[in-house]
Amino acid sequence: MAAAAELSSSSGSERSLEQCSSPLLTREVLCEVFRSLHTLTRQLNLRDDVVKITIDWNRLQSLSASQPALLLTALEQHVLYLQPFLAKLQSLMKENSTATEIRQTEAETKSELRAIHPTEDLQDEGKPKDCDVGDVKKTQNLFDPEVVQIKAGKAEIDRRISAFIERKQAEINENNVREFCNVIDCNQENSCARTDAVFTPYPGFKSHVKVSRVVNTYGPQTRPEGIAGSGHKPTGMLRDCGNQAVEERLQNIEAHLRLQTGGPVPRDIYQRIKKLEDKILELEGISPEYFQSVNFSGKRRKVQPPQQNYSLAELDEKISALKRALLRKSREADSMAAHLP
């Protein structure tokens, strides 16, 4: 019984001692934390006018001690908050050490080159005259890493190139849809902006493709006729309008539009050219690929037989005539069947 009483009394005294020392230990840890802040400012050489931490140690000792669990949680959160900054500083130190090693290697290589080829044998700095090919290649490989603008790996560069191509393709697709298709039916499996095109005129134009008209304020048309044709001898091309440049323009446009050449020439030749050029501009505004298959050459194109080429109006007229003939034959057949007994 006496031994049990002694054990209980000793354990109770130890428990009371721990309870008394726990607030003191917590207060001591808190004081050391604030002292570390003072130490940090001194290590960073920060003056009092930059960072000033004022702590009343007497009042801090007299304050009631905080709970150890609360202090532990606060310190752990603070350490976790500082860990990303530690990682950034470590990576920065590695980069600085790598740059320092590169500069040291460059300096050593330059010193070796100077030792092998003294300055008396060099006419210009950076242009060795008696160096062998290997030393010249070494000097060419030396460069400042700060000059490199794109610091990325091959995979990243390939990703950027593919992203650029995809973005440009998306812009082209969007432009085709905007210019050639008014409404897109997303439920269709097979569709295209060109095949499903709905004629939507471009704002300010008669077509759905933006075109620009060039106005030449100075050119052959503004010059006197005597100056324009004074230095040229008359050739076979001058028999139509009397001006070689104008005749060439007419031939190019007529070949471009596949018009039948010959016939009476209007009196105002420039008005004729203007009408032809306006027609080309209108057709190219409807579709840029309208004349894509036309190949220009220096020679004039041969005129195809008129019976092989038909316009839309001529085709419509032939179709309507064929319908009328078939309708007339069917009526005649019906009338003959009605007269039969």
Curated annotation (Swiss-Prot):
GO biological process: negative regulation of transcription by RNA polymerase II; positive regulation of gene expression; positive regulation of JNK cascade; regulation of cell cycle; regulation of cell division; regulation of DNA-templated transcription; regulation of embryonic development; regulation of transcription by RNA polymerase II
Modified residues (Phosphoserine): S91
Record region (Leucine-zipper 2): 312-327
GO molecular function, one term: identical protein binding
Subcellular localization: Nucleus; Cytoplasm
Keywords: Acetylation, Cytoplasm, Isopeptide bond, Nucleus, Phosphoprotein, Repeat, Ubl conjugation
Modified residues (N6-acetyllysine): K299
Region of interest (Leucine-zipper 1), ranges: 269-283
Main location: nucleus
Statement: the UniProt record of this protein carries the keyword tRNA processing: no
Keyword field contains Chaperone: no
GO cellular component labels: ATAC complex; cytosol; mitotic spindle; nucleolus; nucleoplasm; nucleus
Sequence segments annotated as region (Interaction with MAP3K12): 170-341
Glycyl lysine isopeptide (Lys-Gly) (interchain with G-Cter in SUMO2) crosslink site(s): K94, K127, K137, K151, K233, K299, K302, K323
Functional note: Inhibits the MAP3K12 activity to induce the activation of the JNK/SAPK pathway. Component of the ATAC complex, a complex with histone acetyltransferase activity on histones H3 and H4.
Subunit structure: Component of the ADA2A-containing complex (ATAC), composed of KAT14, KAT2A, TADA2L, TADA3L, ZZ3, MBIP, WDR5, YEATS2, CCDC101 and DR1. In the complex, it probably interacts directly with KAT2A, KAT14 and WDR5.
Protein name as annotated: MAP3K12-binding inhibitory protein 1
Species of provenance: Mus musculus (Mouse)
